[in-house]
Amino acid sequence: MANTLHYSPQALKDLDEIFDYIFTDKQNPIAARNTIEGIKNSIAELKTLDNIGVKVRLPGDLETPYRFIQYNNYLTFYRQIEKDVYIDRIIYGKRDYIKLLFG
């Protein structure tokens, strides 16, 4: 049985902001579309693959409930509880994601 994906409102906002930034600021509508499509395709893998990606740890090697997968420069942070996968954030990889997630 496949996992069910649940996007948080913030994750959906992140996707919109990524698209808008590439489309408007970088003036590249094709790259904007391709980037969002690539991120969504990488997230779709979570339907069939359990707990893939890297575990997120805090300083001091403290565990968190998060894992992340990467598409190009973007990191998708998610939690998996049984067959439910919660997509919480999609963040540019060079940002301080610890602060954004736990800040």
Question: Could you say what each language-model-derived stretch is?
Answer:
Residues 2, 53-55, 59, 63, ...:
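Generic secondary-structure boundary/loop-capping signal
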Residues 10, 39-45, 69-77:
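A short, hydrophobic secondary-structure junction motif
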